């Protein structure tokens, strides 16, 4: 299990954009399961939507991507890389995620060829599917990541 401070040693995300509270299962380079406890204090609930707070779907996908990045970048082969979103395919949202929900984020890493890879993600609340889809990512050396435009 990894706590937030350990996650931050692997990926660069920080508050308010770190969307994973802990990792509860991990097979380095292959898969991970993370948890996000969704609270009413999330900054995005201020405007999405007043009186009817719903976690934006794009942030659910970002949370899945962060879990996948932890699984991949924690593997010795990829520790010196930075992962970037390259695309999403077949994403479907099945239920809203609201304050008080515990989001379970499961990611299976697929093929990685050269510096491009895929992962399949599923987000659930109380066993009910909230979102799923395929994530595409690019792996770059940190210096290239800072200078790529």
UniProtKB/Swiss-Prot annotation:
It holds the Pfam family FabA. Disulfide bonds: none annotated. Gene3D superfamilies: Hotdog Thioesterase. It catalyses: a (3R)-hydroxyacyl-[ACP] = a (2E)-enoyl-[ACP] + H2O. Involved in unsaturated fatty acids biosynthesis. Catalyzes the dehydration of short chain beta-hydroxyacyl-ACPs and long chain saturated and unsaturated beta-hydroxyacyl-ACPs. Belongs to the thioester dehydratase family. FabZ subfamily. This is 3-hydroxyacyl-[acyl-carrier-protein] dehydratase FabZ.
């Amino acid at each position: 299990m990894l706590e937030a401070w350990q996650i931050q040693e692997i990926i660069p995300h920080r508050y308010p954009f770190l969307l994973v509270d802990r990792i509860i299962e991990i097979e380095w380079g292959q898969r991970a399961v993370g948890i996000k406890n969704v609270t009413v204090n999330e900054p995005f609930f201020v405007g999405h939507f007043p009186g009817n707070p719903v976690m934006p779907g794009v942030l659910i996908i970002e949370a899945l991507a962060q879990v996948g990045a932890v699984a991949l970048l924690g593997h010795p082969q990829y520790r010196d890389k930075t992962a970037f979103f390259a695309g999403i395919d077949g994403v479907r949202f099945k239920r809203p995620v609201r304050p008080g929900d515990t989001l379970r984020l499961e990611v299976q890493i697929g093929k990685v060829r050269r510096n491009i890879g895929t992962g399949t993600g599923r987000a659930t609340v109380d066993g009910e599917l909230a979102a799923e889809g395929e994530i595409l990512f690019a792996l770059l050396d940190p210096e290239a990541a800072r200078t790529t435009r």
